[in-house]
């Protein structure tokens, strides 16, 4: 039996649904109340995997009008996942993880103007925040320009998400075997 849910026209899924989906390999790492129970390495690994899932989800979106709410909700979940990754990488003592997180922040900063146009603010610390009114009213084509498979921002983010996950996996293996 398949675990895949097929979403028809008119079905709206919450950002919490997408967040749980991104953290499917470790769901508790995606909840703010449970994150403190994990080591930094465990969080970095879970966040790296989740960020890769978020990028995959967004780059496979069709950005059609009938999926408008789902697209916006998956972007909201991406924001939370991105912020979680920066937090766990920032608290790590691993230079590779820190460097990849810094590069991810730099890439996002390069796109701050485009993100701002759809209601996403790049904060001074590199984290992202959505501004509800503009986020909910921004044209879906602007989301597509940033988050589709052809978008340079997503392509570059994907590269660093892969690097973050690999660094976190390596760090996790070192701490469990050493």
Q: Where do the protein language model's features map onto the residues?
A:
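Polar, low-complexity export/assembly segments characteristic of proteins
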Residues: 1-178
């Amino acid at each position: 039996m398949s675990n895949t849910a097929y979403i028809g026209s008119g079905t709206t899924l919450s950002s919490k649904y997408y967040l749980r989906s991104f953290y499917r390999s470790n769901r508790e790492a995606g909840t703010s109340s449970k994150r403190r129970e994990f080591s930094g390495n465990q969080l970095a690994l879970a966040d790296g995997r989740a960020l890769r899932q978020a990028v995959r989800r967004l780059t496979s979106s069709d950005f059609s009008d009938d999926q408008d709410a789902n697209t916006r909700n998956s972007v909201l979940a991406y924001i939370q996942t991105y912020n979680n990754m920066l937090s766990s990488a920032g608290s790590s003592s691993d230079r590779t993880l820190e460097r990849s997180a810094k590069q991810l922040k730099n890439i996002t900063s390069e796109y701050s103007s485009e993100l701002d146009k759809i209601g996403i603010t790049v904060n001074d610390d590199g984290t992202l925040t959505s501004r509800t009114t503009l986020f909910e009213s921004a044209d879906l084509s602007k989301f597509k320009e940033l988050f589709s498979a052809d978008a340079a921002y997503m392509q570059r983010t994907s590269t660093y998400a892969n690097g973050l996950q690999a660094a976190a996996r390596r760090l996790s293996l070192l701490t469990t075997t050493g």
